[in-house]
């Protein structure tokens, strides 16, 4: 009624608070008054046997997956597209170290950043290692981390001294196995080791020029990768010094191969074959009479 006045002494009371469901924070905690600090609250408790926000377990890195096929790149050579350096580590064999018996060489390949690229293994017979030593004919199979053969290197038997034009060494490079993509051919020179990097049509693409002395006592031994007219260096094959004890007791060597990142992957693969050929020609034990080979 308009103009109604409450009786004297009457004071209106506030309405009763609305009941808050169990598990929800109090309103005062969510909306603190002036001068009050907010009170941390907890969300509703999960039901027994369940977690509100399950946390993932530790992430375990799996094996590297296969490389994505690229147009214009031979199958299996995709790992060479984005790299400009390959580190080659030859595994030391205990039988070879302690008994002096020559075994099939095995290698591990990594990129300059440490990524595993694959494994390489020699295939040769005991008679060839016994009679021919470092000049033995052989086949090297390079497999990717998934154990798929992606590269095959074939070295025929060439008799005679490498300083004679009739005894020049050669390595054929196949990728995929069965398809020749290039050759490594030793170029005759009376004092300096030289090699020609040839394409599938045996046309020269690059040259590899080594030092006059390849002993490299205490230092790395470098073979320069040059243009086909030898006017400019574009890469390097380095046999890394492994220390006096290792060099004296084993012929397990470490190599570093450097090339331009935009170089054709086929040429990169042929340079890899040149690295293996250089290892056998200059840094492998020389064969001879006696027990210098063993079946592995």
UniProtKB/Swiss-Prot annotation:
Keyword annotations: Apoptosis, Calcium, Lipid transport, Lipoprotein, Membrane, Mitochondrion, Mitochondrion inner membrane, Nucleus, Palmitate, Repeat, SH3-binding, Transmembrane, Transmembrane helix, Transport
**Chain segments carrying region Disordered:** 1-58
Q: Which cofactor does it need?
A: Ca(2+); Mg(2+)
**Position of sequence motif SH3-binding 1:** 7-15
Q: Where is this motif: SH3-binding 3?
A: 66-71
Q: Chief location of this protein?
A: mitochondrion
- Catalyzed reaction equations: a cardiolipin(in) = a cardiolipin(out); a 1,2-diacyl-sn-glycero-3-phosphoethanolamine(in) = a 1,2-diacyl-sn-glycero-3-phosphoethanolamine(out); a 1,2-diacyl-sn-glycero-3-phosphocholine(in) = a 1,2-diacyl-sn-glycero-3-phosphocholine(out); a 1,2-diacyl-sn-glycero-3-phospho-L-serine(in) = a 1,2-diacyl-sn-glycero-3-phospho-L-serine(out)
Q: Where is this motif: PPxY motif?
A: 15-18
Anything noted about its domains?
The Proline-rich domain is required for phospholipid scramblase activity.
Protein name, per record: Phospholipid scramblase 3
Instruction: Give the lineage.
Output: Eukaryota, Metazoa, Chordata, Craniata, Vertebrata
Q: Which gene encodes it?
A: Plscr3
């Amino acid at each position: 009624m308009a103009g109604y006045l409450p009786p004297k002494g009457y004071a209106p009371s506030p309405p009763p608070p609305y009941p808050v469901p169990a598990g929800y924070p109090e309103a005062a905690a969510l909306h603190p008054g002036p001068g009050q600090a907010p009170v941390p609250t907890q969300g509703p408790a999960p039901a027994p046997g369940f977690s509100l926000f399950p946390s993932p377990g530790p992430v375990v890195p799996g094996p590297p997956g296969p490389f994505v096929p690229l147009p214009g790149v031979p199958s299996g050579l995709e790992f060479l597209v984005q790299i400009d350096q390959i580190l080659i580590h030859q595994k030391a064999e205990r039988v070879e170290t302690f008994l002096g018996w020559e075994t099939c060489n095995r290698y591990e390949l990594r990129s300059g950043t440490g990524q595993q690229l694959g494994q390489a293994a020699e295939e040769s017979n005991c008679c060839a290692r016994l009679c021919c030593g470092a000049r033995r004919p052989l086949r090297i199979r390079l497999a990717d981390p998934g154990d798929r053969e992606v590269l095959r290197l074939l070295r025929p038997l060439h008799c005679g001294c490498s300083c004679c034009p009739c005894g020049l060494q050669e390595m054929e490079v196949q990728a995929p196995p069965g398809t020749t993509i290039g050759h490594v051919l030793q170029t005759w020179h009376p004092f300096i080791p030289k090699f020609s990097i040839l394409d599938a049509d045996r046309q020269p693409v690059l040259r590899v020029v080594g030092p006059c002395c390849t002993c490299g006592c205490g230092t790395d031994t470098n073979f320069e990768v040059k243009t086909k007219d030898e006017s400019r260096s574009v890469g390097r094959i380095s046999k890394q010094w492994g220390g006096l004890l290792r060099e004296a007791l084993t012929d397990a060597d470490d190599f570093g191969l450097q090339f331009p990142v935009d170089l054709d992957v086929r040429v990169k693969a042929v340079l890899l074959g040149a690295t293996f050929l250089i290892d056998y020609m200059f840094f492998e034990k020389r064969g001879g009479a006696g027990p210098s080979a063993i079946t592995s």
